[in-house]
Amino acid sequence: MLQEDKSSETMHDPSTRGVETRNVTAVDSPLETATTSESPETERTNVAPAKRDWRFWALLVSISLAGLLTALEGTITSTALPSIVNDLGGGHLYVWVVNGYLFAMTAMQPMYGQLANIFGRRWPMLGATALFVLGSGICGGATNIETLIAGRILQGIGASGTTVLTETIICDVVPLRERSKFLAIVMGMIFLGTALGPFFAGLIVQYSTWRWTFYLALPVGGAALVALFSFLKVKYQKETNLATKISTIDWAGNALFVAAISSVLIGLSWAGSVYAWSSFRVLVPLFVGIAGMGLFMVFEGSRFAPNPTVPLHLFGNRTSVGVMIMTFFHGIITIWQLYFMPVYFQGVLGSSPSRSGVQILATILAILPAAGIGGFLMTKMGRYKPIHYASWAVTLIGLGLFSLLDSGSSTGAWVGFQIVYSMGAGMLVPTLLPALLAPLSESDTALGAATWSFVRSFGMVWGTAIPAAVFNTRSDQLAPELINSPALRADIMGGKAYEHATSAFLGTLSDAASEQMKNVFSRSLRQTWLVSLAFAGMGLLAATLAREVPMRSELDTEYGMEERKPKKASEA
């Protein structure tokens, strides 16, 4: 069991970065015994919202735009990929158009947290956005698959930075108590981009060329760059020279981390699609990567890492550990639902990809207000545990309802079930990061947010691999029983069911064969949704690990917005 009092007292050095004793001694203590100057109930209720000028709102719009764009480009290739491969070729390399982006975005997130602490928030954010725009231009102009993959990797490196820094900047300029409201806006835009990517890709491919799925980022990204340059003006320590700053980067730790995570991601990308899960080509990179992650954590806690990318004290209290676990499972469930509701729409209802994109709007249109409600409640109550319990419970109900869907389900059923699920999952969106940061000092904001972003992204990777394996395995079991044609059974067996769960494939079959195939897909999806309940249940259990920590209502950070220079008397 984690030690609460001793670990929290030694977690930070109170002499550094102006950390107040209150934030150290009260870390992760029960509310009833928190050693604050006010009672917890007073802290929760007597908080007046800070007044914010137009510069704050301009900054919020700027970082929201950057987050929306990078999230949109993260999923936009899922629908456009067949057209891209048809034009550029590339054979088996096509998978790296998706995986290259995913690998770069996931593996680089902790490093961006450290860069934000060393160089401030402004230039890493501008650099990441510029890299993303450059990568988009390379992708749009690619004449072969190798160039496209290189552009996607650049996009991923840029997206990694914008994701981490968007959340970090909000934490810098908004007190902990109010953060969930504004995180609901920013992260809601990120979620919106993630969900709408395939829909926009379908429209673009249908009415134009796939290249505009990438060229679209140029004017939008350019506008985001101009806005960020104009409005992202936050404080940071400028006294240290460049050579000293570069020398403080945890080069060895970051290299070890990137290598370990890449190994895990390679294993997951091959599992169930290129090789069977039991293949040594899958198991070896998975085991090597997991061992590498363990070695990375040992290194980060050693004397060889004086300025670690992921300080171990981030995991030194049960609240932060509980929130990290919840974040991992929330990442799994989020992508699980976004990827497998379209399988139902296309593989069971027979919808086209573009119509499927419209049908899943029920999730999007419900999750955004749900995030707003979660953020409002957290700010109003100054509590997160009741929200987490309620959110996971409703998420479990929604996932369970999905298992009832079949080819005869009404529109009201699949719309209503999405709304129920989204109300639960949506309230978690803005309330996990503030809960993670509650027991930590403000000096840990960037590293904490970066680690949290990585855990969420890492969960999303598993959220595609696990349900695909469940779906394919169940289809292999059902096909001999439900499909009459041996040739048709061979089409979907051996891990190929997921890739065939499309309206295009169903359209090539006779009516009788199509009904048999829909039955296989429907029953396989039912199993997939039932398995998802286990992961959401573990998220609910993790909520019991966290403790309620009083949420600070004042900022104590070195990276807040720069004060406006007063006008001279002659100008007044």
From Swiss-Prot:
Residues glycosylated per entry: N23, N317
Subcellular location as annotated: Membrane
Chief subcellular location: membrane
Pfam families: MFS_1
Membrane-spanning intervals of the chain: 56-76, 88-108, 123-143, 156-176, 185-205, 212-232, 255-275, 282-302, 321-341, 358-378, 386-406, 419-439, 451-471, 529-549
Keyword GTP-binding on entry: no
Keywords annotated in UniProt: Glycoprotein, Membrane, Transmembrane, Transmembrane helix, Transport, Virulence
GO MF term set: transmembrane transporter activity
Gene3D superfamilies the UniProt entry points to: MFS general substrate transporter like domains (1.20.1250.20), Multidrug resistance protein D (1.20.1720.10)
Composition bias, Basic and acidic residues: 1-15
Record family assignment: Belongs to the major facilitator superfamily.
Name of the protein: MFS-type transporter pydD
Organism listed in the record: Acremonium sp
